[in-house]
Amino acid sequence: MSATDIYNAVQAAFDGDPGPAEPPPLEISGSGRGDSTIPVYADKLLNRSALRDLPDPESLIDNVLDHGTVALLYGKWGTGKSFIAQDIAASVATGRHWQGRDTRQRRVLYIAAEGAYGLKGRLHAWETGWHTPIRDGQLDVLPQPVNLTRPLDAANLGALIGWAGYGLVVIDTLARCMVGADENSAKDCGLIVDTLHRLRQQTPDGRGVILGVHHAGKDGKTFRGSTTFEAGADTVYSVAAEERVIILERQKRKDGPVVDRHELKLESIEGTSSCVIEVSQLTSETTVRAVTGPREVVHGERESFIGEYSWQ
C-alpha cells in the first residue's frame, strides 16, 4: 500500500468515505453569491465576529503544553525523556503542579508501546515521592503499540480517546507506533503527523493534547527522521543529559514565547525501586521546586542517583 493509499484509508476510517482522490474540475458559473449551490467548505468559514468569539489559547500546563495541540518530546536513549513524559502524565492526571507550573487536571491515556512493567515502579515512586495517589480512571495505560500507519488501528484509537474523554494522550514511543513507515520520508511522516492531529480532534472539544515521545538522531541533539515531524507539530521539546543534569528545552511553540528551559535531575525515593524528576538548579529559566506539602525538603537533602537507574 502506498503512502497515498494509507492517507486515503485513514481519512475514510475517521471521516467516512473521503470521495475521489482528485477533485472534479472547478466550474465558475459567474453568478457569485447568488449561486444556489453551497460550496463544500462554506460551513467552515469564520467571519470576523466568529473569529472574535473563538476561545483564547489556554494551557494544559502553564507555559509548557497548550490545549488543542500536538507536541513532541525527543532525546537520545538514556536522557530521561520517558521519565519526563510519565511525570507530565501523572501531574495532569492528578492536577498536581508540574515542576511548579499550574496544571489543569484531565484524564490521561499513556500508550506504553515498549511495555508497561517499568511503569509500575515509576508510578509507585511518583505517588510515594509526591504524596499524591493516582486513582483509577485518572491515568490509564495501554500496554502495547498502536500502529498509526494502519487505518483501522488509528481509527480504533481515536474511538477510544473520544469514548473515554482523554485530555492528554502520551505515545511512548512514536517509533514503535509507526511500524512500516519510513522515518526519513517526508510523505510518510506527514501522514503520521496528520493522524496525530486527527487523534487530537477526538479529545474533548478537540482541545486535548497529543504528546509523542521520539528518539534523537545520531548526533543526539536533533530529531530523528524527517523534519516534517517538527514542522507539523505545535510544540517541540528536546531532552539532553549533561553529566548529572537533565536539560529539557523547548525548540518550537506555535503560539507564545518559545524559550522554556528546565534543569532537572532524578532522585531516588526511599522504599521504592525508582525515582522522581526534580529541579536540579534554581535559575531564572527553571521553575521553582516542585515538592510541596508533607514532602517539602531543603534542596539537595536527598542523594541523587542519576546513572544507577534505567532512566530512558
Segment roles from a protein language model:
Residues L65, Y110, D172, A233, ...:
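Conserved RecA-like P-loop NTPase ATPase core
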Residues S91-Q105:
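Post-Walker A helix-loop "phosphate-sensing" segment adjacent to the P-loop in P-loop NTPases
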Residues I84, I88:
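Hydrophobic positions on the alpha1 helix immediately C-terminal to the Walker A/P-loop
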Residues S2-H67, T79, G129-D136, L142-P143:
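Core recognition of P-loop NTPase motor domains used across DNA-transaction enzymes
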Residues Q11, A21-P25, G30, D35-P39, ...:
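C-terminal regions of RecA-like/P-loop NTPase motor modules
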Residues L72-L73, G78, S82-F83, L168, ...:
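Phosphate-binding/switch region of NTP-binding enzymes
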Residues V70-A71, V108:
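Conserved beta-strand position immediately N-terminal to the Walker
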